[in-house]
């Protein structure tokens, strides 16, 4: 571990010099890339600096104990050694965590897809509630949310809604949300007060750059049509809506949110690239084998990951057995504690696998 940390410290020193080079500062793309590297390395180097100081202090305390004759000073030295040993253990754990391989997609923007599942009209309403929850969370994080495609349900909410979320670390936080979300509550139309259970599925994909997904436009059939509103009525007399069909895989993507056909095409291509990436990633994960897959983020769309129990006012994430007894706040976008708990569980799992 020390050799790796020394190499990181050396790299950090090199980047520190490069980042103040006027020629690099003039190239915004290169400067942004270096600045990102600098921030990532500094997190590790800062802890490593404290760790080296701890080792030096520990060595001094042990030396003092070996030569000191006075009982009072020896007791002080022993206390300091005990304290420094505890700090050393904690710092080593922190460094192990910081050295864990990072998901290269964590810094990417997100394609978020929410679809009503079982439960009829109530499932559509719940899909709308989930969209609002993520929208409010995006606001709190100062991320930008843009709707790509929406199909409203007859009783409010959505049969399906797809959007992009742009912001620092968006995928790294939202990737744990993929799966089936279940709701238990009394619908507004229920006269006997019976609790109904319905569900909605959430898919979170990293938004991929053109260079990261090999997309041959010759493999894509493009259809244009007039955008439509609820019930199918036309809301636009121009053929601005886009439907893309990826012929080799059969994946179909539509976008009609923008008035411009070009903008709809750009958004649809983003979704298509993300879905193709997901398909390729699933092949790789299947090849790895079930025993090495993460329980926290398996990525399986059929996994029932969370229950929102309205009568009891609680939200439970079944992957880690974590419950929050403040459902109204969660539905208003306060999902940070849930995500943090999932991140901690994921990191602990990866540390154990690497042990």
UniProtKB/Swiss-Prot annotation:
Cell compartments where the protein resides: Cytoplasm
Keyword presence, rRNA processing: no
Question: Quick one: a GO cellular component term?
Answer: cytoplasm
Positions of modified residues (N5-methylglutamine) = 233
Q: Which GO terms describe its molecular function?
A: translation release factor activity, codon specific
Q: What does this protein do?
A: Peptide chain release factor 1 directs the termination of translation in response to the peptide chain termination codons UAG and UAA.
The record's similarity note reads: Belongs to the prokaryotic/mitochondrial release factor family.
Name it.
Answer: Peptide chain release factor 1
Task: List the source organism.
Answer: Amoebophilus asiaticus (strain 5a2)
């Amino acid at each position: 571990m020390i050799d790796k940390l020394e190499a990181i410290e050396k790299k950090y020193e090199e980047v520190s010099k490069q980042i103040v080079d006027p020629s690099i500062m003039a190239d915004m793309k290169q400067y942004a890339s270096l600045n990102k590297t600098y921030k990532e390395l500094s997190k590790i180097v800062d802890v490593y600096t404290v760790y080296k100081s701890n080792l030096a202090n520990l060595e001094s305390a042990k030396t003092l104990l070996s030569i000191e004759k006075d009982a009072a000073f020896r007791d002080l030295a022993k206390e300091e050694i005990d304290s420094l040993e505890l700090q050393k253990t904690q710092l080593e754990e922190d460094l192990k965590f910081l050295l864990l391989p990072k998901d290269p997609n964590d810094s990417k923007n997100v394609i978020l897809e929410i679809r009503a599942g079982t439960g009829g009209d109530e499932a559509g309403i719940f899909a709308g509630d989930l969209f609002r929850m993520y929208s409010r969370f995006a606001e709190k994080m100062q991320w930008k949310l843009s709707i790509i495609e929406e199909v409203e349900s007859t009783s409010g909410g959505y049969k399906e809604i797809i959007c992009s979320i742009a912001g620092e670390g968006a995928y790294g936080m939202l990737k744990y949300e993929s799966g089936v979300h279940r709701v238990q509550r009394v619908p507004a139309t229920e006269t006997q007060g019976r609790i109904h259970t319905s569900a909605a599925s959430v898919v979170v994909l990293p938004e991929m750059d053109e260079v990261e997904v090999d997309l041959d436009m010759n493999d894509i059939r493009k259809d244009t049509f007039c955008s439509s509103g609820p019930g199918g009525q036309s809301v636009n007399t121009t053929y601005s809506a886009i439907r893309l069909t990826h012929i080799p895989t059969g994946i179909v993507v539509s976008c009609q949110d923008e008035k411009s056909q070009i903008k709809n095409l750009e958004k649809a291509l983003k979704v298509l690239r993300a879905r193709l990436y997901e398909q390729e990633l699933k092949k790789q994960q299947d090849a790895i084998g079930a025993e090495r897959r993460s329980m926290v983020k398996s990525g399986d769309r059929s996994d029932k990951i969370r229950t929102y129990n309205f009568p009891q006012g609680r939200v439970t994430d079944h992957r880690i057995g974590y419950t929050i007894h403040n459902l109204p706040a969660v539905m208003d976008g306060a999902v940070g504690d849930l995500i943090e708990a999932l991140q901690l569980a994921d990191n602990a799992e990866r540390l154990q696998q690497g042990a």
